[in-house]
Amino acid sequence: MEQPWPPPGPWSLPRAEGEAEEENDLDVFPSSPRCPQLPGGSAQMYSHGIELACQKQKEFVKSSVACKWNLAEAQQKLGSLALHNSESLDQEHAKAQIAVSELRQREEEWRQKEEALVQREKMCLWSMDAISKDVFNKSFINQDKRKDTEDEDKSESFMQKYEQKIRHFGMLSRWDDSQRFLSDHPYLVCEETAKYLILWCFHLEAEKKGALMEQIAHQAVVMQFIMEMAKNCNVDPRGCFRLFFQKAKAEEEGYFEAFKNELEAFKSRVRLYSQSQSFQPMTVQNHVPHSGVGSIGLLESLPQNPDYLQYSINTALCSLNSVVHKEDDEPKMMDTV
């Protein structure tokens, strides 16, 4: 008989030498949180606040992939051209130099925007009034009624159906194990998985389970980078996730640094949001004993995200020729970042 998910019992850190071999061993998952009944529509405002945090997280990852990863591609191309002395390559070399300069400028612009946003959030700490005003002005709150309800139902159904596997992926701690798991379950490479993991991080931090939050945050950023790489390259994400793991395991200069920087920034944002007034009502005492429903209950209560990206980003320097389709036999521990 299938056991209820998540299993009961106190949470603990995953095994030091890797993830748990059996899903039944994973007693680290918290009880399913739910929003308390707060006066004045505060519960709904709380959900909107988390939704806004998810939206901003996607925008940050988008900037990392668009600027930092493309910059690394341009630098690699520039380096390869420098190895040749043929005059016929002079024009190509000049174009590559211009591309590097433009990408560096874009990266600096995004960095300044991110710093300004973080400073503003530290001052405001996401007060209820600020959230209410921000939510009201967001286009995805006032969007047309034409939103496809079938897509919404499909997204909710997906997270309900594959909640166990999404959580299992969240607990993996090796690059090779994560790649192998996605190879066995390619349907998990999607926006719904990324959203579930992001929300899970917020609730873990609200429960004061920082160590577990950092583990899930790593996998959340992994999935986000895969999705943004696919959009950047205009390919199916199920066909390019191996490229991400190839670059991550090789710790290629530029690529891995962009991932580590975004991971640390994401964890900092989660901690910052958890300190805001909008997260204060979400405490451990508001949890109820597990009844087999699963944490998908809160996810279903959130409004569906819109099309996260409103414009396409530079794809000229994106190449998937180096994708490695062969799985490594020997697992390799990921760096603890």
Curated annotation (Swiss-Prot):
Region (Self-association) residue spans: 2-171
Region (Interaction with Hsp70): 267-337
Bias-annotated ranges (Pro residues): 1-11
Phosphoserine modified-residue sites: S32, S88
Location of the region described as Self-association and interaction with Hsp90 in the Swiss-Prot/TrEMBL record: 147-277
Main localization category: cytoplasm
Family matches, as InterPro entries: Cdc37, Cdc37_Hsp90-bd, Cdc37_Hsp90-bd_sf
Region (Required for interaction with STIP1): 278-337
Keyword Zinc-finger recorded: no
Residue segments, region Disordered: 1-42
Keyword Cytoplasm tagged: yes
GO terms for MF: heat shock protein binding; protein-folding chaperone binding; unfolded protein binding
Single Gene Ontology BP annotation: protein folding
Subcellular location: Cytoplasm
Cysteine-cysteine disulfides: none
Any one Gene Ontology cellular component term annotated for this protein: cytosol
Keywords of this entry: Chaperone, Coiled coil, Cytoplasm, Phosphoprotein
Coiled-coil regions, chain positions: 85-122
A Pfam family recorded for this sequence: CDC37_M
Family: Belongs to the CDC37 family.
Binding partners and assembly: Self-associates. Forms complexes with Hsp70 and Hsp90. Interacts with CDC37, FKBP4, PPID and STIP1.
Reported function: Co-chaperone that binds to numerous proteins and promotes their interaction with Hsp70 and Hsp90.
Name of the protein in question: Hsp90 co-chaperone Cdc37-like 1
